[in-house]
Amino acid sequence: MRRVYTDFHIHSCLSPCGDDTMTPALAAGLLKLAGYDVAALTDHNAVGNCPAFFRACESYGLTPLAGMELTTAEDVHVVCLLPTLERAMDFGRAVDAHRVRIRNRPKFFGNQLYMDAEDNVTGEEPDLLPNATDLGLEDAFALACEFGAVCYPAHVDREANGILAILGDLPEKPVFSHAEFREPDKREEYLIRYPRLAPLTPLFGSDAHRPDAIVDPCFTLEIADSADVAAAVMERLRSKP
């Protein structure tokens, strides 16, 4: 067994709330410099910058995961981590069919830039990405699982788009076994307020949208000592808490 430093919640300049300088390549380089072993790119309702992130991670020696921060019909943010880049691209196309199409207004919401691994802009997403899909919470998890994803609610310790703030509590029988915290020190406080969190395995995600928001590693995950680190991480996340 071995322990790896992870951050499973990173945005790029494809997310309109992300800084235009947060290119997939820059994110990969900064994550490596910060000391991470594994990181996931999780833009809002999109996976279009994952290929560039993967190529950049390969050059930097960082293990990448392809992911998405999916917005459910209830406006809850859910992190979806996919087993391979190919499955992630397929999942992205599936989610596209459930997006509510509203034209992006870059001057108001921000740019939504597709990039290559050399920091070149290859296109721009015309429709606003972060708004809610038509997928309810359980339907979103069911769809993601069809593509082999590991899913869990994002930033449960945040008011905006956090499942606890939106729904008031966790479902009595949740379809997920993890919960993401932005600030690990808040977990004990939240366990007192929301006892249903207790059985869930806590994960850390910085939710970084800007280069200066990539923080020093503070969370490790114990995985099998395997040459395929990404597969070992996914296997660990699928295991029961």
Located regions from the model:
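Charged catalytic cores and adjacent phosphate/nucleic-acid-binding surfaces used
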Residues: 1-8, 12-30, 34-36, 47-90, ...
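A short beta-strand/loop micro-motif in the catalytic core of glycosyltransferases
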Residues: 39-40
